[in-house]
Amino acid sequence: MMNYRLFLLDEAVEFLLALSSADRRFLRAKLEAIRDFPTHHAEYYRRDAIGRRIEGCVAGKFAIEFWEDTADMDLKIISIAWADGRSPRRR
């Protein structure tokens, strides 16, 4: 188990706040599981503009992207979105 702190970018927080409480609870549990064992949850990866490895997974109806900041011991959640690509305002 990693001892990462969990950080969410503003856009991820805004997405979470627009969800039902049940969806927020589901995502909170998934984010904590990812924080504890990030590599167990990585289903794909891509490189960002500076070459950093961004990993992602699908959790139910949500897509989550994150990266491990090993220098700061943070797991940074950079994106939470609908897995089917729909608009953030629709449920």
Per-region residue spans from a language model:
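A short, surface-exposed loop/turn module that caps and links secondary-structure elements
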Residues: 32-58
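Lipid interaction determinants
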Residues: 6-9, 21, 49-51
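Enriched for short, Lys/Arg-rich terminal
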Residues: 1-5, 14, 18, 25-29, ...
